[in-house]
Amino acid sequence: MVKFTADELRRIMDYKHNIRNMSVIAHVDHGKSTLTDSLVAAAGIIAQEVAGDVRMTDTRADEAERGITIKSTGISLYYEMTDESLKSFTGARDGNEYLINLIDSPGHVDFSSEVTAALRITDGALVVVDCIEGVCVQTETVLRQALGERIRPVLTVNKMDRCFLELQVDGEEAYQTFSRVIENANVIMATYEDPLLGDVQVYPEKGTVAFSAGLHGWAFTLTNFAKMYASKFGVVESKMMERLWGENFFDPATRKWSGKNTGSPTCKRGFVQFCYEPIKQIIATCMNDQKDKLWPMLAKLGVSMKNDEKELMGKPLMKRVMQTWLPASTALLEMMIFHLPSPHTAQRYRVENLYEGPLDDQYANAIRNCDPNGPLMLYVSKMIPASDKGRFFAFGRVFAGKVSTGMKVRIMGPNYIPGEKKDLYTKSVQRTVIWMGKRQETVEDVPCGNTVAMVGLDQFITKNATLTNEKEVDAHPIRAMKFSVSPVVRVAVQCKVASDLPKLVEGLKRLAKSDPMVVCTMEESGEHIVAGAGELHLEICLKDLQDDFMGGAEIIKSDPVVSFRETVCDRSTRTVMSKSPNKHNRLYMEARPMEEGLAEAIDDGRIGPRDDPKIRSKILAEEFGWDKDLAKKIWAFGPETTGPNMVVDMCKGVQYLNEIKDSVVAGFQWASKEGPLAEENMRGICFEVCDVVLHSDAIHRGGGQVIPTARRVIYASQITAKPRLLEPVYMVEIQAPEGALGGIYSVLNQKRGHVFEEMQRPGTPLYNIKAYLPVVESFGFSSQLRAATSGQAFPQCVFDHWEMMSSDPLEPGTQASVLVADIRKRKGLKEAMTPLSEFEDKL
């Protein structure tokens, strides 16, 4: 095998046509890490014999122990193509050597933020789908994320060995199963028609679908078989490819192809006849140890085995034979090289997704052309904890220019605004490193189009940042990432020994760096809160916190707490008025719920404060039935200027209105961050400023007078508009055999869940159940479910939506009012809610 050095890798890094940056994405347990192993083995990093069992990219102890991937891990692979195989390659290339930067990402939904970070710095994705389970919820979520980032997918149908060994399906049935899986994936991809990307769907007959068995380390695309038969029958390779998939049948008796099954017993579909049956035959021969038949068959295929390998029996024999005949690495790496874009191609169409500034300045042009001599543009997508405790590598991708050891860079954080000093640092890179699985190799410099890890920047980057070098023209940062899940589960942590407090504070800072999604905050009552995407995610984070970031100091954690949101379900019963502290200014306001779907549109970023007001008012008028003029009078969104609440100006001819606009908005940001019920964020409320009466002297209507008044009037208008609590709801997908359905339903009913879809997977005994489950009830759900179904059901929870609670929090004794009292008690507020009379004034 090739053992390559860092210098060789560095040489290929300059050939930007020969680089492929790709991530491996899939549903949990569909075999990503196992498949990645075969690729790593081909590059000579681990031995072929153990591939499939090592899971090289699961570098953490708890990953190996749980058998799941938690963090996304990068590896650089070197691969040399033969001239023969490159004959049909039409794109630009420099020589035969290729560099593949591969990132193995987690499939478990709690870690989907890791996937987002991986996707940002790659251009192509290998989507792994289990041939029997098919396209699952998480496959769909991740695929949509990838297409949203304009990443070109190729598909592999994995766990083929199950078809031959476990289920013993016959050819036609297998073909139907595979074609259904591919069709389901294409349905998702078809919704992303992008003129720049072209057609993103995958087709076996074009070579963009592979069939693999990660555990046994073999895989094929139809290209492999087409090549083999083309020389044998003397037909053109491309013609043979088309015949190996779809409605093409071959009858060996008459030696003719036809478009439909002629009904004769020997007539079979092309795929079955030429791909499926030969594999099935060889596997059967190996498993039955009929070696006298096996060697002549292999000789025909041109496969030679070493003498010691001929001694093997049963499964090990089959594994070696299949690996020698159809090595997974060759099939998959060739598919990536042929069908995934190089950085040079990809950055042309990705630049508008990546760059925030004008698309014609020098930085955008450097990204578009992937120019190594242009200005540096580098996006850090995550921080990786180094082996010496407390230090981090900044891991990211160079989009333009070069990054080298000792170079001075400008670090632009997520809140940086061009032309201002906020969130901007200048620092030099201590050294640049490339990642090769468990070890790192230091290199002098890394040119654009590659992934890189840097040492020495960890004090200045929290989660992600953009790096550029010093230039006269300020660069705009690269867009921040959008996560598909939100941190809704929180725990309070404290130290067992009070003297460990400084360790805890330091540890929380490091934890916030190491995970792209965790939010660590400190409440006013002084407790430290850690928020994550779900139970498993939090568990892993707290384990990291205790073992890695606090040096093993013990921590106590509270029961998990769920964030709620506050909303209203009706228009205010009357217009409420509040007076300023000096009694000279009066604000009149009403609250009303937003239209259906508007809050979600703001969350997704389709409507936001930075949009062009003309476009925004058009969307609001057409989709949500707003008045055209009203849509132009939105003052602000909140909380944090982008949240799903807004203030709209409904005043007619009021003097000095513009002077107090900023103060009202400031009061609104404050109020929408902590509502009157339990100081939780507001959601989906539209506040209308009806009238304002102001003092004529400017000194009596300053911010100190208006801001608290605005906050009080907002609270009063919310309380008069039938306030309600919103609770977060998971969508749970459960796969289970029919016998386990009863247990699933009973557990869901205890937990206030309800099933909204149940379907049987065609061709399998499994049922797919989708249900809604309130996050509050989800703790311990998976262990209860496994107990009730004796381990046959496997749940996946994804945050889905906010559900309004039907009970009224203002009436004592209802479920909502008990919840409000609990939250207030936990936050150290008075248990009784502040009455309306405190917020509303009489004339």
Swiss-Prot record:
Domain of life, per the record?
A: Eukaryota
What is a single molecular function from GO for this protein?
GTPase activity
- Catalysed reactions, semicolon-separated: GTP + H2O = GDP + phosphate + H(+)
Its primary localisation, in coarse terms, equals cytoplasm
Q: Which GO terms describe its biological process?
A: cold acclimation; response to cold
Expressing tissues: Expressed in root, stem, leaves, flowers and siliques.
Gene Ontology CC: chloroplast; cytosol; nucleolus; nucleus; plant-type vacuole; plasma membrane; plasmodesma
What pathway does the UniProt record associate with this protein?
Protein biosynthesis; polypeptide chain elongation
Alphabetized, the UniProt keywords read:
Cytoplasm, Elongation factor, GTP-binding, Hydrolase, Nucleotide-binding, Phosphoprotein, Protein biosynthesis
The protein's matches in PANTHER family, at most eight in alphabetical order, are given as: ELONGATION FACTOR 2-RELATED, TRANSLATION ELONGATION FACTOR-RELATED
Q: What does this protein do?
A: Catalyzes the GTP-dependent ribosomal translocation step during translation elongation. During this step, the ribosome changes from the pre-translocational (PRE) to the post-translocational (POST) state as the newly formed A-site-bound peptidyl-tRNA and P-site-bound deacylated tRNA move to the P and E sites, respectively. Catalyzes the coordinated movement of the two tRNA molecules, the mRNA and conformational changes in the ribosome. Involved in cold responses leading to freezing tolerance via the induction of cold-responsive genes.
Family statement: Belongs to the TRAFAC class translation factor GTPase superfamily. Classic translation factor GTPase family.
- Subunit comment for this entry? May interact with glutaredoxins (Grxs).
Protein name, as recorded: Elongation factor 2
Organism this protein belongs to: Arabidopsis thaliana (Mouse-ear cress)
From which lineage does this chain's organism come? Answer: Eukaryota, Viridiplantae, Streptophyta, Embryophyta, Tracheophyta
Q: What gene name is given for the protein in this entry? A: LOS1
